[in-house]
């Protein structure tokens, strides 16, 4: 078994909506990013890549490459997952923590879990997504952006 950890953060800027966990969430602000700014899927992709020792999302999909401008993070996750499977890994489980004062994530979490399970080809019982605030402390508490942490457990397929 191998464990990976991922972290991502994006500042608010421009107009909404935002995309988190693949879900379009109405909000007055957008997130500044080279891709679609999906902090949840970026952190999750990093966790999965880390567990497989395949580097990180920036190595695989560099923000200096115009091909990834405005990229759909679900597509990036699926491509990373294909590479991980090619190394002989299957999924144990993933756990994602979204850190944001606003907007409220709770109503959107069930759909996030559906999308992640679809993209990883796994059962929803293998996907957990939760959200928390920082009680108005720090940059997320001041409403300057959104952060996310994720962990992933991979299992090496037996031959």
UniProtKB/Swiss-Prot annotation:
Keyword Metal-binding among record annotations: yes
Catalytic activity: 4-CDP-2-C-methyl-D-erythritol 2-phosphate = 2-C-methyl-D-erythritol 2,4-cyclic diphosphate + CMP; 4-CDP-2-C-methyl-D-erythritol = 2-C-methyl-D-erythritol 3,4-cyclophosphate + CMP + H(+)
InterPro entries attached to this UniProt entry: MECDP_synthase, MECDP_synthase_CS, MECDP_synthase_sf
Residues of the signal peptide: none
Residue numbers binding 4-CDP-2-C-methyl-D-erythritol 2-phosphate: 8-10, 34-35, 56-58, 61-65, 100-106, 132-135, 139, 142
Site (Transition state stabilizer): 34, 133
Name this polypeptide is given: 2-C-methyl-D-erythritol 2,4-cyclodiphosphate synthase
Primary gene name: ispF
